[in-house]
From Swiss-Prot:
Pfam family, one: ribosomal_L24
UniProt source species: Mycobacterium marinum (strain ATCC BAA-535 / M)
Known function: One of two assembly initiator proteins, it binds directly to the 5'-end of the 23S rRNA, where it nucleates assembly of the 50S subunit.
Family named by the database record: Belongs to the universal ribosomal protein uL24 family.
The keyword Transmembrane helix is assigned to this record: no
Protein name (Swiss-Prot/TrEMBL): Large ribosomal subunit protein uL24
InterPro entries recorded: KOW, Rib_uL2_dom2, Ribosomal_uL24, Ribosomal_uL24_CS, Ribosomal_uL24_KOW, Translation_prot_SH3-like_sf
Keywords linked to the UniProt accession: Ribonucleoprotein, Ribosomal protein, RNA-binding, rRNA-binding
Subunit annotation: Part of the 50S ribosomal subunit.
GO biological process: translation
Amino acid sequence: MKVHKGDTVLVVSGKDKGAKGKVLQAYPERNRVLVEGVNRIKKHTAISTNQRGAKSGGIVTQEAPIHVSNVMVVDSDGKPTRIGYRVDEETGKRVRISKRNGKDIQA
């Protein structure tokens, strides 16, 4: 999967189209990413009491994962781009590059 944890992404489709956020978690086996502030859902949780007596629970708002095809990585220029790979000559490892300008993508 070409989107990694820590990347800044732009949502290109869906109810949050146009929103930018940081990838909090990537789920490559499901092709989904969890983006900060995007796809917020309300989850009903049981009210529980912790050791200090504070209550938590009720209706909690949290982010839900979205499909990786609905986001684009934002490059160093602040514009959305597609991602490609090149092999680094010194280390022999794959490096992600921006298809828009050819620069390396730093996570």
